[in-house]
Amino acid sequence: MVTSTPVSDGRLEADSGNTDLLRKTGIVIPTYNAARYWDRLQAALDRQGVSCDQIFIVDSSSTDNTRKLARRAGYRIKQIPKESFRHGATRQMAAESLSWAEVLVYMTQDALPFGQDCIKNLIGAFSDPEVGAAYGRQLPREEANAIERHARLFNYPAVSDVRTFASRTQLGIKAAFMSNSFAAYRVSALMEVGGFPRNTIVSEEVTVAARMLIAEWKVVYQADAAVVHSHPLSIAQEFSRYFDIGVHHGRSRWLLDAFGGASEEGRTFIVSQLRFLLKNDPSLIPIAAFRNLSKWCSYKLGLHERYLPIAVKEAISSYRHFWEEERETLLAARPASGKKGQHYHLEPQPKKTGDERRPKHRFEGLI
C-alpha cells in the first residue's frame, strides 16, 4: 500500500460530479464575535457556488452583531451559550443537525476562502470513494512576519498528498494531521468512526483523522483548496496552545501508541525555520528559538498535567470552561459521606483495568 502519495501538480483533479456533490455539502462555521471578519468572509463564501442555506453558523452567544449579519445573509443559525462550546461536541452537534449533507466542510470565522473554487476543490478529494477526510492549504496573511509565514509554508506546502495508516511509518503523528480551520469530511466515514470526540480539549480533527486511518480510510491534503489563515500569536498564547495539545496527547495515549510521537517532525521544523529566517529575517532567530523552547516546555507540561492541580491547569490553558466542567464532574463524584477533614484531589480517576476498560466496539476507546 502506498504510504503518502504526492501529487506533482499541486492538486487532486475534481471529477465532473463535484458540482452535484457541492449541492450536498454543508458548511459549518463556529463563531464568536465574528463581525470584524464578516464582510470579507461573506463575500468570499458568495463566490463559492453554495447557497446560503447550506451554511450553518453555530454562534457562541456573540456580544456583537454576528447573528444579525448571519440572518441578513440568509445563513442557518444556532445560538449556544458561550460556556457550552466544545471543539468536538459542538462540531458533532452541527454534523447531526445537517442530516441531509453527504459532505461537511468545517471552517473557522477567520479563515478566508482563497479564489472562487476552494470549496469545490476541497471536496474534489471525495471523487475517490476511499477518502474519508480532506483538509486544505492555509496561506499566511499579507502582514505576517517571517516566523508566522514559515509556520504556514512548512505545515501547508504547495503539493497535495494522500495518507493511509501505513503513512505513519514515515510521518509519525503527522500522518493524522488535520485542521478544522478548513477541512471536509465524508459524513458516512465520520459517523462510522464515532463522530467528533465530545470531551476533548483540542485536536478533535486529529482524533477523527487517526480513527479514519485505522479504519482504512484515506486522508487527503488538498493543496489547491486554500484559505488565508494565520495568527500573530503571543508567546503566552502559544504556551497555552501547546499545553492544551500536550493534554490531548496525554489523555489519548492510543494516538501516540498507534502513530508515534512528533519529535522527528519537531527537529525538521526547527531546521527548516532556521534556514527560512536566515534567508528572510535573521533578527527573528533569537525570539524564534525562545518560542520553540517555550512550546516544547508547555507541551511536556500538558503531557503530564495529571500531576497539576486544576487551578494551575485553568491558569495555563486556553479553555477555562473545559477545566471548570472537569472540576464540577469530580466534585460530583465525591463520596456522599466521609470523615471530617478528608481531602480529595480534584484529579481524573485512575484508569480502569482488565475487562472494565475494553471498548464495547472498535472505536469506543479512541477518545
Regions found by a protein language model. Give the residues of each.
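A short, conserved alpha-helix in the catalytic core of glycosyltransferases
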Residues: 183-185, 189-194, 199-226, 232
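Glycine-rich, basic loop-to-helix element that forms the pyrophosphate-binding segment
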Residues: 81-99
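Non-catalytic, C-terminal membrane-associated alpha-helical segments of glycosyltransferases
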Residues: 244-247, 258-367
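Conserved donor NDP-sugar-binding/catalytic core segment of glycosyltransferases
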Residues: 112, 116-148
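Short, well-formed alpha-helical segments that are part of the catalytic scaffolds
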Residues: 33-47
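Short beta-strand-to-loop acidic/aromatic patch adjacent to the donor-nucleotide binding site
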Residues: 101-112
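Short, flexible, basic/aromatic active-site loop/helix in glycosyltransferases
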Residues: 136, 154-175
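A conserved acidic beta->alpha catalytic loop
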Residues: 59-67, 112
